[in-house]
Swiss-Prot record:
Transmembrane segments: 6-26, 218-238, 268-288, 303-323
Subcellular locations according to the entry: Prospore membrane
Gene Ontology annotations for the cellular component aspect, listed alphabetically: prospore membrane
Keyword DNA-binding: no
GO biological process, one term: sporulation resulting in formation of a cellular spore
Family that this chain belongs to: Belongs to the SMA2 family.
Role summary: Involved in spore and ascus formation. Required for the efficient assembly of the precursors of the prospore membrane to a continuous prospore membrane.
Species this chain originates from: Kluyveromyces lactis (strain ATCC 8585 / CBS 2359 / DSM 70799 / NBRC 1267 / NRRL Y-1140 / WM37) (Yeast)
Stretches of the chain found on the membrane's Lumenal side: 27-217, 289-302
This protein's record includes keyword Membrane: yes
Keywords, sorted A to Z: Membrane, Sporulation, Transmembrane, Transmembrane helix
Name this polypeptide is given: Spore membrane assembly protein 2
Top-level taxonomy: Eukaryota, Fungi, Dikarya, Ascomycota, Saccharomycotina
Compositional bias annotation for Acidic residues: 347-357
């Protein structure tokens, strides 16, 4: 019985450890308002490759123009402060090399060293680990800061505009006649441009869909961990109640067997989902770093503390699943063994009683002679 209580404590400890580890998924958000951030991956822009130098110089001028446009049409700004707001530190700078993004499943945090007024902030992101969503929402956030409007609304609006443009472009390319006419005007020497654009948009749509699905797998993983903990507590309570009341095991066989089977399946599902999520983070980091084409690399990404936390939790979930399969055994086998032990004990008690009767019948010290014993047996 002592071993059974120790197994209860170990299973509960592992289940609580798995459950509490899921709290790291809800950091790096503005709604949670937590002092820590445990990102799945961290990225920043590079300025030491030929591609990044050309791209960022062009993008910087474009965003500076948009920033000036936003400031000029903001009627709430005092004209005496307009010159100070033209300072480069107040302009949109999402592609600055000193910016560092900490991306998590439900939000991201940004650290920008060149901005003294707002060098760190966190934003909710409902699109999971989608790096495109992070950049577009951050662009909307900075437009909201410049125009002194609600930054969350502007971030969401920019993302909606992006999705609308992608959907419209998809519908446009589905019409081969109109799509070919436009692309021939832009690139008359490339007859395969139509198919290339379709492939690019298809990859973008797949990328968005995969990130949304993986975000919901994180939610499902949290729910499964909670169910595992509740079923484990219920299973332990049923075992203790059975020990106290000494009720027949057959009455509890079906319930206990069902709990054992469900908990086993949930533990395996938890470990499998976590493993798939880790593979996605590793693949995403590999794709962002663009290891194959170093000259085209404009972003450098690395695993964050949340990713390492996921890897550690995967091994904990794996051990928990093994312990569930080892200790949460169905009660049919246990009841059969208990019944066999009870029957063998009853047979041994009966044989011992017969031996004592024969011994007392043949023992002179008991006051009974052998003749009396013979007459008693007859």
């Amino acid at each position: 019985m002592r071993f059974k209580y120790i197994s209860f404590i170990i299973l509960i400890s592992f289940s609580l450890l798995v459950w509490f580890s899921h709290l790291s998924n809800f950091t790096c958000t503005s709604s949670a308002n937590l002092p820590i951030c445990m990102p799945q991956y961290v990225f920043h822009f590079k300025d030491d490759t030929p591609t990044s130098k050309v791209l960022f110089s062009t993008v910087k001028e474009f965003f500076s123009l948009l920033s000036f446009f936003t400031l000029d049409f903001n009627w709430g700004i005092d004209l005496s402060e307009l010159q100070d707001r033209y300072n480069q530190s107040n302009l949109i700078n999402i592609f600055h090399p000193s910016n560092t993004y900490y991306v998590n499943a439900f939000g991201y945090c940004k650290h920008q060293a060149q901005d003294e007024k707002l060098n760190h902030y966190c934003i909710d992101n409902t699109n999971g680990l989608n790096i495109i969503s992070v950049l577009i929402r951050d662009l909307g956030f900075q437009f909201g800061v410049l125009s002194e409007t609600n930054v969350k609304i502007t971030g969401d609006s920019f993302w909606i505009i992006y999705q609308t443009l992608i959907n419209s472009f998809n519908k446009f390319l589905e019409d081969d006649k109109r799509g070919n006419t436009l692309l021939k005007m832009i690139t008359p020497n490339d007859p395969n441009e139509m198919e290339q654009w379709k492939t690019r948009l298809w990859l973008i749509n797949i990328y968005d869909a995969v990130n949304v699905v993986l975000k919901w797998t994180v939610v499902a993983n949290c729910i499964l961990a909670s169910l595992c903990l509740m079923l484990l507590l219920f299973w332990m309570w049923m075992q203790i109640e059975h020990k106290k009341t000494q009720s027949p095991i057959k009455q509890l066989n079906w319930n206990i067997n069902s709990i054992c089977s469900i908990t086993r399946c949930l533990s395996i599902c938890n470990a499998t989902i976590t493993f798939i999520y880790i593979l996605h983070i590793l693949l995403l980091t590999f794709m962002i770093n663009c290891f194959r084409y170093k000259r085209l690399q404009i972003i450098h990404a690395s695993l964050g503390t949340g990713a390492w936390f996921h890897i550690a939790r995967f091994f904990v979930e794996l051990i928990f699943a093994v312990l569930c399969f080892k200790w949460m055994t169905p009660h049919s086998a246990m009841s059969a063994s208990v019944m066999s032990e009870t029957q063998s004990t009853a047979v041994e008690d009966e044989e011992e009683k017969d031996t004592e009767d024969n011994y007392s019948a043949l023992n002179p010290a008991s006051g009974t002679t052998a003749v009396d014993g013979f007459l008693l047996t007859v």
